[in-house]
């Protein structure tokens, strides 16, 4: 019996010279995605996709390796300059930004787009208990 073999298309380089690096650093993980100016994802990586599990995903070292992997893919697509958008309060935010520089990409602008409530809704009860212990 013959089996059907799927043909896998090889991705062509997109030739994007200027893009945006979105770095989302939470308390558990760091997600990095490189997009073009319109927001189409060119490459991405996270601490979990690199192979880290559990509490090791939130470390700055894991964010560094994830950024290096995503930046390498972005450079293969022709990206040379990036605008960095940082979001979140995790450990890997600054480590990821520094890794972008060492991976050979020029940073044009750095923005912190962390959402900050202007006295929005009341936080849940468990938040108050945590604040009292500090």
From Swiss-Prot:
<feature type="compositionally biased region" description="Basic residues">
    <location>
        <begin position="123"/>
        <end position="134"/>
    </location>
</feature>
<comment type="similarity">
    <text>Belongs to the universal ribosomal protein uS11 family.</text>
</comment>
<protein>
    <recommendedName>
        <fullName>Small ribosomal subunit protein uS11</fullName>
    </recommendedName>
</protein>
<comment type="function">
    <text>Located on the platform of the 30S subunit, it bridges several disparate RNA helices of the 16S rRNA. Forms part of the Shine-Dalgarno cleft in the 70S ribosome.</text>
</comment>
<dbReference type="GO" id="GO:1990904">
    <property type="term" value="C:ribonucleoprotein complex"/>
</dbReference>
<dbReference type="InterPro" id="IPR036967">
    <property type="entry name" value="Ribosomal_uS11_sf"/>
</dbReference>
<keyword id="KW-0687">Ribonucleoprotein</keyword>
<keyword id="KW-0689">Ribosomal protein</keyword>
<dbReference type="InterPro" id="IPR001971">
    <property type="entry name" value="Ribosomal_uS11"/>
</dbReference>
<dbReference type="InterPro" id="IPR019981">
    <property type="entry name" value="Ribosomal_uS11_bac-type"/>
</dbReference>
<dbReference type="GO" id="GO:0006412">
    <property type="term" value="P:translation"/>
</dbReference>
<keyword id="KW-0694">RNA-binding</keyword>
<feature type="region of interest" description="Disordered">
    <location>
        <begin position="114"/>
        <end position="134"/>
    </location>
</feature>
<comment type="subunit">
    <text>Part of the 30S ribosomal subunit. Interacts with proteins S7 and S18. Binds to IF-3.</text>
</comment>
<dbReference type="InterPro" id="IPR018102">
    <property type="entry name" value="Ribosomal_uS11_CS"/>
</dbReference>
<dbReference type="GO" id="GO:0003735">
    <property type="term" value="F:structural constituent of ribosome"/>
</dbReference>
<keyword id="KW-0699">rRNA-binding</keyword>
<dbReference type="GO" id="GO:0019843">
    <property type="term" value="F:rRNA binding"/>
</dbReference>
<dbReference type="Pfam" id="PF00411">
    <property type="entry name" value="Ribosomal_S11"/>
</dbReference>
<dbReference type="GO" id="GO:0005840">
    <property type="term" value="C:ribosome"/>
</dbReference>
């Amino acid at each position: 019996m013959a089996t059907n073999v799927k043909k896998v298309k090889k991705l062509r380089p997109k030739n994007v010279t200027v893009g945006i690096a979105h770095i989302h650093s939470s308390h558990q993980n760091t997600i990095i995605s490189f997009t073009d100016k319109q927001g189409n994802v060119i490459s991405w990586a996270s601490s979990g996709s690199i192979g880290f599990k559990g509490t090791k995903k939130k470390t700055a070292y894991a964010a560094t390796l994830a950024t290096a992997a995503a930046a390498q893919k972005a450079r293969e697509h022709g990206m040379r300059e990036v605008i960095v958008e940082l979001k979140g309060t995790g450990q890997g935010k600054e480590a990821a930004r520094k890794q972008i520089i060492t991976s050979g990409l020029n940073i044009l602008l750095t923005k912190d787009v962390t959402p900050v409530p202007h006295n929005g809704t009341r936080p849940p009860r468990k938040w108050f208990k945590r604040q009292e212990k500090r």
